[in-house]
Structure formats: structure tokens, C-alpha cells
Amino acid sequence: MSSVIASRRYAYAFLSAAEAGGFLETVTGEMQMVGETLAASRDLQRALASPLINADRKTHLLEEIFAEAVGDKMMLFLRLIAHKKRAGILGGITQEFAALLDEKNGIVNAAVTSATELSDSQQKALSRSLEGYTGKKVRSAMKIDESLIGGLSVKIGDTIFDGSVRHQLQLLREKLVAVEA
């Protein structure tokens, strides 16, 4: 089984259990903190993924790092992951948990790239437009790329809306080349 599929299954199972048990709000913050800790420590990621370190040692490592910072339910989940020899995909589990939670709450992530910085009113108008298109709440991550020349590009999931001047020039170039051929 691929690590992405396994990560999604563990994340879904934990999310479902947390929702049914009434502790979803608590573990949401804890899961985010675990993910941030993993993202910040390459050594921790390597240790958890290493086949040379046994499950008991990985459990002990997770307990040392997170026992004071997380509650009993989250610690039990971390022990389970280590016991099942899935500690190496813990980072993926935290990402999938966040994605499933967003899906449950009707939130989509949009990567917005513009040639210049958008004003607050432009960002709000863009968010309203994207929310109207998707029918969901939109969380935007803004980025500036001057090579777009003008306009902007928006990526939501697998869909890209490219309204940049660079893209329009590229389309025009392709049409001119096709006419010449």
C-alpha cells in the first residue's frame, strides 16, 4: 500500500474516532503541532522513517517529544502509529488529517500568484469570486511572481485559472506559430 493511501486511511480513522468521541477540537490543534514539529526537524523525520530503529524506540522517541505537549488520545494515536510501524508516514498523516478536516468543514485551499501585491479589497473580491465558483470557503495563499507581467494565476486542487499577461502572450504566440505553419 502506498504511503499516501496509508496516511489518508490513518488520518480518516483518527478523524472519525475523534469526531465520534467528541475530542476532535482538542486533537486538531495537537495534530497541527505534531505536523509542524515534524516539518521543522529533518532529523526526527529520518529517525521515524529509519528501518534501523525499532518500533519500541520510535514509541519512546515520540513519547519523549510529545508527552508533555499532547493529550492522552493523541499520545495513544502516536503510540499506535509507532507500534504498527507507520511512524515514517506520520508527517503524511498530519497533512491528510488537515486536508480531511478542511474537506469536512467545506474549505478549499487556493494558491494565488499575482504579478504585484493585491490590495485588501482586491483579495476580498477575489475570495468572494472563488467562493462563488467553488461553493466553499476559500483559504488563499498569496505569492508574487513578477514574471507573470500582469494579472494573476489561481490554483485550486487540480484546476488552474491563468489570467496572467504571460499566459495570454504565450497563447497569442502559439496562435501566430500555427498560422505561419
UniProtKB/Swiss-Prot annotation:
Major localisation: membrane
Disulfide bonds listed in the record: none
Keyword Ion transport found: yes
GO cellular component: plasma membrane; proton-transporting ATP synthase complex
Assembly and oligomerization: F-type ATPases have 2 components, F(1) - the catalytic core - and F(0) - the membrane proton channel. F(1) has five subunits: alpha(3), beta(3), gamma(1), delta(1), epsilon(1). F(0) has three main subunits: a(1), b(2) and c(10-14). The alpha and beta chains form an alternating ring which encloses part of the gamma chain. F(1) is attached to F(0) by a central stalk formed by the gamma and epsilon chains, while a peripheral stalk is formed by the delta and b chains.
Task of the protein: F(1)F(0) ATP synthase produces ATP from ADP in the presence of a proton or sodium gradient. F-type ATPases consist of two structural domains, F(1) containing the extramembraneous catalytic core and F(0) containing the membrane proton channel, linked together by a central stalk and a peripheral stalk. During catalysis, ATP synthesis in the catalytic domain of F(1) is coupled via a rotary mechanism of the central stalk subunits to proton translocation.
Record-linked PANTHER family: ATP SYNTHASE DELTA CHAIN (PTHR11910)
Name assigned to this protein: ATP synthase subunit delta
Organism: Chlorobium phaeovibrioides (strain DSM 265 / 1930)
Lineage: Bacteria, Pseudomonadati, Chlorobiota, Chlorobiia, Chlorobiales
